Amino acid sequence: MKVIVVKNQLEGGKIGLDLLKESINNGAKTLGLATGSTPVEFYNQIVNSDLDFTNMVSVNLDEYVGLDGSNEQSYRYFMTKHLFGEKPFKENFLPNGKATDLEAEAKHYDQIIEENPIDWQILGIGQNGHIGFNEPGTPAEITTHVVDLQESTIKANARFFESEADVPRKAISMGLASIMKSKNIVLMAYGKEKAEAIKGMVEGEVTTELPASILQNHANVTVIADEAAVSLLSK
């Protein structure tokens, strides 16, 4: 696991863009994408770049249950606003949070990932160590699944909604096994509130109690983090 320490999100976004360009030059065709505040500057860098995604496919990590793509809090809306609206892809895949049969939708999404192996995956990390919506206790072998969101995740995401009560309680998420199939993974983390999770992920033991720690078992992981996020690392 390679750790790159940056001054701020702007520098992190630029380094992320360089890594993405390198991967595309090496033949990457499918990008795994994440949402939330962490990758926004990275997406800004992409939008202002000369990259062309019209022959590429994107696969997003997750989506809230109950929100359709026109809802401003849905992850499809987020992706359209920050990336897809400016940089069209050949195809964009996100879980369908309005599916009538959520378990069938999860299986369908596994099939999409099988047909579109992810070459380059961007990740954030939650304060509790979640990646995607894989909360503490999630089995390592799980693929796409329906998740009951933990209170800490609901509280962390409440800032994007009018009130905490409006935050969906469920999501569909790629599983840890799905994420681990990605050829290359770049995880971004900013701020001191991520420091405990980063320490556990990089230096702790691999445990389901800190889902991101499974990334220690992946051959190609790069962490882009600011000084605050790496402040608890011993080396």
From Swiss-Prot:
Its EC number is 3.5.99.6. CDD domains: GlcN6P_deaminase. It catalyses: alpha-D-glucosamine 6-phosphate + H2O = beta-D-fructose 6-phosphate + NH4(+). PROSITE patterns: GLC_GALNAC_ISOMERASE (PS01161). Pathway: Amino-sugar metabolism; N-acetylneuraminate degradation; D-fructose 6-phosphate from N-acetylneuraminate: step 5/5. It comes from the Bacteria. GO terms for cellular component: cytoplasm. Keywords: Carbohydrate metabolism, Hydrolase. GO terms for biological process: carbohydrate metabolic process; glucosamine catabolic process; N-acetylglucosamine catabolic process; N-acetylneuraminate catabolic process. The keyword Coiled coil does not apply. The active site is at D62, N128, H130, E135. GO terms for molecular function: glucosamine-6-phosphate deaminase activity; identical protein binding. It is an enzyme of class 3 (hydrolase). Catalyzes the reversible isomerization-deamination of glucosamine 6-phosphate (GlcN6P) to form fructose 6-phosphate (Fru6P) and ammonium ion. Belongs to the glucosamine/galactosamine-6-phosphate isomerase family. NagB subfamily. This is Glucosamine-6-phosphate deaminase. The gene is nagB.
